[in-house]
Amino acid sequence: MAVACAAPGSTFSKQLLFFLLVLVLFCDACQKVSLHVPSHLKAETPVGKVNLEECLKSPSLILSSDPAFRILEDGTIYTTHDLLLSSEKRGFSILLSDGQGQEQKKLEVVLSAREKKVFRKRHTKEPVHNRSKRRWAPIPCSLMENSLGPFPQHIQQIQSDAAQNYTIFYSISGPGVDKEPYNLFYIEKDTGDIYCTRSIDREQYDQFLVYGYATTADGYAPDYPLPLLFKVEDDNDNAPYFETKLTVFSVPENCRSGTSVGQVTAIDKDEPGTLHTRLKYKILQQIPDQPKHFSIHPDTGVITTTTPLLDREKCDTYKLVMEVRDMGGQPFGLFTTGTITISLEDENDNSPYFTQTSYTTEVEENRIDVEILRMVVHDQDLPNTPHSKAVYTILKGNENGNFKITTDPNTNEGVLCVVKPLNYEVSRQVTLQIGVLNEAQFTNAANAQPPTMCTTTVTVKIKDRDEGPECQPPVKVIQSKDGLPAGQELLGYKAVDPETSSGEGLRYEMVGDEDNWFEINKITGDLRTVKVLDRESKFVKNNQYNISVVATDTAGRSCTGTLVVLLEDFNDHPPQIDKEVTICQQEKDFAVLEPIDLDGPDNGPPFQFLLDNSSSKLWTLESQDGKRAILRQRHNLNYNYYSVPIQIQDRHGFSAKHVLSVRVCDCTTPTECRMAVKEERDAKPNIILGKWAILAMVLGSALLLCILFTCFCVTTTKRTVKKCFPDDVAQQNLIVSNTEGPGEEVTEANIRLPTQTANICDTSMSVGTLGGQGIKTQQSFEMVKGGHTLESHKGGVLGAAEPGRYAYTDWQTFTQPRLGEKVYLCGQAEEHKHCEDYVRPYNYEGKGSMAGSVGCCSDRQEEEGLEFLDQLEPKFRTLAKTCVKK
């Protein structure tokens, strides 16, 4: 700290006293300051602190009129040696000046010594005055940080007004006494003097709040505890230091003067807002030191450039040795030094240039995708950045696009390649001019002119070689009419042999003819149509039909060309229209017709719409802009289908008749109409069965056949079998006679039944009267177990029959009605349940028979008793044989 003091007994002291005398006589006086101090002051003891800025702002010269005191810049007053205040007061003046003598101030300071009082003890018998306790007024006090002592050092004295009447004992408590830090303060209980036992670090403890107590000998406290605030005055014992040990800034090269580079910051642990923490920054050294490029603001620490001549290519890094000092940068302030690094960012301020001004190379003709040359460039900018990466351009000589130049990403070289064949017969040498730039845009340095593009010349020599045919041009266009019939010839594709400049010896072949329209003459290359040319074919795009032709020489070398057949439109398609029309009555009563014409625009619209006379009573047809027409109802029609014939013509009168199927529907939109369109209504179901459906049908049919066969077997086995004859038919119906001749002729049946059809043994038969003539249906009476069959075939007149056959016929005529009746009645009993059980009596039944009665009841009881067929008697066998023979 800057402390100005007078040393007695020296020449300087005399001059200083003279100067003080002048200041005292001519300076203005400020407000007087009074300080209460102990009567005994030791050397280097802080007496107090005054506010100098209230008297004079930023004084550059501070002097004391009393050599026993020195004053710091912050207003702190220190003693220079031990002092004993003999009188109660001692005064001196602080003289302030701005350094140039233009303004001077004087500040009066008065020191008052504290008086010692005589205490007496309070007697217990003395009455206690009835008064309320008072709170002591706190006494301000401060401690100097890092005080050198001697210790214990007197700090303050507390006294109670009750000491005038009683003997008071004093005590203190709080931080520094009975709390951390312990035993830093103590008090003399009799006098109230407070002492400090050791030095204090303000950065650790900036103040102490201690409570003082005043009590009598018997423990009575006449006053409230007194709060004592001991503030530790800062001592400039901490040097500032930079916040970061390693600081790196970057700034673009060629930047303008005054460009901010960065800001350095430092920290001082001393008391903020004081001179101890007022920091100043300074650049001590720049490495390299010439020329000077940087400066720093002393208060903010902001580093800026002082020149626009920063060039990364000359020096890419600078180091600055910095100093930060407290006490406002005064020489006696504490300081610290540090080093920061400033890196220059690259800018594209250097153009690339070729290492050679010209190059020569060669290449064979007709070679493609081959590298022919590499060119090297230099660039002083930072490698592998857009500022140094080269971009090559062919400026001249590549009008046909035969060459391409690229950049090798690894070496930054320019690579020249041939991408399109060169022809030795056309040109034997090509000269190229190539330029180079950087990927990044060029940045001009200060006061510098923009550079020009660096260029070089490349001479490419073309080497001759025996080559195949050339297809030039690659695409040839010929014209043809739409609808050209088959068998017509067209000019084809012609290739040339560059060695002979003719097409002799070449053979042609088509490799691309999508719709097979043409055939090619292998010698001349001309085309012949094999189909009718149709411009509306799906293979025709934009009126063009493409054909690929290959020309091959005798050595097998070939070239490929494309022949484009440009078809001229022909009016061969009438206008077409959608024949299904829907009119939604809820929305509108008309439909918009929009025909299309597959021909070109010259053979298309405007269209002319004509309505057939048969539909004019119900409909009107109005043309709209030649492309559309409106079909409108003359009046609201019923919801139904209507056929409307119309005719549409294109601009050349080519027309076609159409029958529209108009669906008048109750709907808002056609999709809501539930009436099926005509095509859907008339369409036959088109059902295609898959393999699984067919397999399912086959398996289902097989299963159904199995079920039917099973039912047939069960029914055949269990159903009721109607017997054709009872078991005793032979004995009951044959008359015993000794003659073989015919019996007595019977002309009428004993029982007459109406002619009817009865089911006997599941065979239809006609039952008539006995002796009736006519044709009889063949009948078969089959005995299952006997193996014999009784048959009746178609016969003629009974009179013409043989005698034996006549007897059999009479027997059959007699028994058949009766058997039919019985079968009929049994059937009625089975179905309607109205037949009664009865027994038919006969006059003669002959020998007993195993078959029993022929009544319906016995027949029902023995439906399946066919065992008698196994033991037929001889008479029945004879009759059966007779019946079988015919």
UniProtKB/Swiss-Prot annotation:
Residues 715-886 are cytoplasmic. It comes from the Eukaryota. Residues 1-29 form the signal peptide. Residues 30-134 form a propeptide. It is found in: Cell membrane; Cell junction, Desmosome. Expressed in the epidermis and inner root sheaths of hair follicles (at protein level). Residues 135-691 are extracellular. Residues 135-242, 243-354, 355-471, 472-575, 576-682 form the Cadherin domain. Glycans are attached at residues 130, 165, 546, 613. GO terms for biological process: desmosome maintenance; establishment of skin barrier; hair follicle morphogenesis; homophilic cell adhesion via plasma membrane adhesion molecules; negative regulation of epithelial cell proliferation. GO terms for cellular component: desmosome; plasma membrane. Disruption phenotype: Knockout mice are fertile and born at the expected Mendelian rate. As a result of eyelid fusion failure 10% of pups are born with one or both eyes open leading to corneal damage, inflammation and corneal opacity or micropthalmia later in life. Skin is flaking and scaly at 2 days of age. Mice grow slower than wild type litter mates and are 30% smaller at weaning (21 days of age), however at 3 months of age they have caught up and are indistinguishable by weight and size. Thicker epidermis at all body sites with additional layers, principally in the spinous layer at 2 days of age. PANTHER family: DESMOCOLLIN-1, DESMOGLEIN FAMILY MEMBER. Binds to JUP/plakoglobin. A component of desmosome cell-cell junctions which are required for positive regulation of cellular adhesion. Required for desmosome adhesion strength between the granular layers of the epidermis, as a result moderates epidermal proliferation and differentiation. Is therefore required to maintain postnatal epidermal barrier function and normal hair follicle morphology into adulthood. This is Desmocollin-1. The gene is Dsc1.
